[in-house]
A protein has these predicted regions:
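Active-site beta->alpha loop and helix N-cap motifs at the rims of alpha/beta catalytic domains
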Residues: 3-132, 142
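Catalytic alpha/beta core domains of metabolic enzymes, predominantly
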Residues: 114-117, 129-215
Length: 215
């Protein structure tokens, strides 16, 4: 979801946020990601992130599953954010690997395993190799053997890479709008896309048609 701000730029516009949630649900979307990259996650304060998750989950009120992004530079900070999202009622969390100075594969696995032990809700791993430690097919196989780790959002922009993730048997979301029809026909569980914010009916219709194999 995108994040609506007040006209003066000082704070989130909660009424518009709630209205946008209602519009998306009215269009038939199957779930919402709160504090997404599209929602300017990297530029939000911790208080704004907490508000988006808390107010979002409260307003959605069980009408659809909610995924809350809790990415952070350090594992301990990420665990704190993950627990807060779980306490707020999020259905799942979405977490990028450590970024800025990416660790080795061993460090990436440690990061996700520590978070998985700290919460009970599912974790969506977030592959953005342009911005963080890349998640490879082999690393993903190791990660999905850990309880709570199954889903991955692939925003690599490489359809062949997405297909490799699918072949592991894990559940894969594609995060690149332009690949939507091809990713869904290849077997992706779903899309986490920005376009749904301004054309939700078309996005839902595309997903449903492909799900029904009406290519």
């Amino acid at each position: 979801m995108c994040t609506p701000f007040q006209e003066n730029g000082k704070g989130i516009d909660i009424p518009r946020y709630q209205s946008h949630i209602d519009d998306l649900l009215g269009a038939g979307i199957h779930g919402l990601v709160l504090c997404s990259g599209t929602g300017e996650y990297a530029y939000l304060t911790d208080e704004e992130k907490h508000t988006l998750i808390q107010e979002g989950v409260k307003h959605i009120n069980g009408r659809c599953p909610t995924i809350a992004q809790t990415t952070a530079l350090s594992t301990n900070e990420c665990i704190d954010k993950a627990r807060a999202a779980e306490d707020a009622g999020a259905s799942a969390i979405m977490v990028m690997p450590p970024f800025l100075e990416p660790p080795s594969e061993r460090g990436v696995i440690y990061h996700y395993e520590a978070i998985a032990k700290a919460v009970r809700i599912p974790i969506v791993m977030y592959n953005v190799p342009q911005q963080a430690a890349p998640l490879t097919e082999d690393t993903y196989r190791k990660l999905i053997a850990i309880e709570n780790l199954d889903y991955i959002k692939d925003s690599s922009g490489d359809l062949l890479n997405t297909q490799k993730f699918i072949q592991t048997g894990g559940r894969v979301f594609c995060g690149i709008d332009s690949l939507a029809p091809f990713a869904l026909m290849s077997g992706c569980t779903g899309m986490i896309w920005g376009a749904v914010n301004f054309m939700p009916h078309e996005c839902v219709n595309l997903f449903n048609l492909i799900d029904e194999k009406k290519y």
